[in-house]
Amino acid sequence: MNKELIDNINKELENKSTQEVIEYFLTKFKNVALSSSLAAEDQVLTDIILKQDKNATIFTLDTGRLHPETYDVMDATNLKYGVKIDVFFPNSEKVQELYQTQGVNGHYESINNRKNCCNIRKIEPLKRALKDVEVWITGLRAAQSVTRVDMPLVEWDENFKVIKVNPLINWQEADVWDYIKTNKVPYNKLHDKGFPS
């Protein structure tokens, strides 16, 4: 991907609203997808995107280790918007092998185990989800982590060979919750119990 193109898109969208950023990509590109963990930020983006395009692609990764509340919010989202979020699962044989070699919670035992688990449960399904995608929309915010402070609105993701868009990059947590309350967006009840994402 041409760095100059990404820089030009960032300049063009610099002072645009989140809705305008999303509209830009939905209208200028064919294969646009939101990856949703069903966390608050992703629910905001789901609402914004589906208000613009009821047929937009939204997917999630079911690692096999999700809380029941996550399935509840997925169901509530599907019902509210009349959609079906695409769900990508890990390869069952690889998960079974992971269990046989590391046990149920082997990912807690070492960094190598954690990386292996993450690769099987998250990275491989994400690769399948992004296979034909041109633009990957995420719910990442700069305020979530020091590693995200300098993250641009639009970037090229070399690992997945896709344009990655972070429309909420400058949002604060209060902005997310204001939007959810104002627009009656379904959210994961784990947030009420102190879970950040």
Where are these regions (language model features)?
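Nucleotide-activated chemistry modules centered on ATP-dependent adenylation/adenylyltransferase
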Residues: 1-197
